[in-house]
C-alpha cells in the first residue's frame, strides 16, 4: 500500500531562509505523490520501504517498518553542500501475511520514478527490499546484465516457499541466470556451512569483513563491475559493528566501521553504473539516541555528495 510522505518529518535547524549556502536538506525536499502524474525532474529521489514482515518471516527482530521515517528526520537535518533538488516519493507499507505483493508494488514505483531523479535512495525496511529493488531494475533494463553488490554480513541465500528478508538474493539468482552476486563484509560466524555451500553452487563472490582493505577490495570490485551493464548496490546495516549501529535487525559484534562502508559505496558509485542505492534493516525499536538513523543519514549524505551520477 502506497502512502505519500509526511512533510512534518522534514524539519531541522533553520540557519537562513534565503541563502542556499546555509540550507539543510529539509529546506529543499519536495514531497511528491508518486501515484500521481510525474513531471518535474530532481537530482535525488527518496522512496521508502516501510515493511518488516519479511524480517518477521525470517525470524528476525521486527521494527524496521519504522526505519524510513526515522532516517528522514536525520537526513533532513544535514547540510546541503551543493544546490541539489530532492524529491521524497513516499513509502510503501503492507499489512498482508507475505511480502510478494508489496515487493511488486515497490518495484513498479522504482520503475515509474526512475526518470524523475538522477539518483535514488531506497530506504527500508527489511532486506526483502533487495528483491523489489532488483525487480525494479529488471523492468527498467530488461536486456542488460545486472551485477548485484551487497554490503552485508550475511549471504541472504536462504530457501523458502515465500519471500523473506533472508531469501532475496537466491530469488534473484534463480530468476536471472545472467545476474552476478558479490558480497562485501561477510561474517564467517554469521552464515552456516550450508549457506557457504549454496554460495559456491551459485558462484557467489565474497570478501569477508576481516579481509576488507582498500587495494585488494577495490580490485575485486572493479573486476566484478566490468562484467555487467548495470550494478545494483544494496547495503544491509547489520554489516556495521553494533557499537556504531545498534538499531538493526541483527546486530554485529565484529562488523565494519562506518568509514569502511562509505568507502565501499564510493568505490562502487565511481563507475557510473549505479543509479539506485537501497539501505536495509534500520530498526528504530533498538536504536540508541537515534545513533543508527543518524549514521544512515550520513551514509546517504556521502552517497549523494560524492556521486558522479549527480554532480
From Swiss-Prot:
EC numbers on record: 3.5.3.8
Gene Ontology MF terms in the entry: agmatinase activity; formimidoylglutamase activity; manganese ion binding
Region forming the signal peptide: none
Cell membrane is among the record's keywords: no
Manner of cofactor binding, per the entry note: Binds 2 manganese ions per subunit.
Keyword Metal-binding in annotation: yes
Co-factor requirement: Mn(2+)
Broad class of enzyme this protein falls into: hydrolase
Binding-site list for Mn(2+) 2: 152, 154, 236, 238
Protein name: Formimidoylglutamase
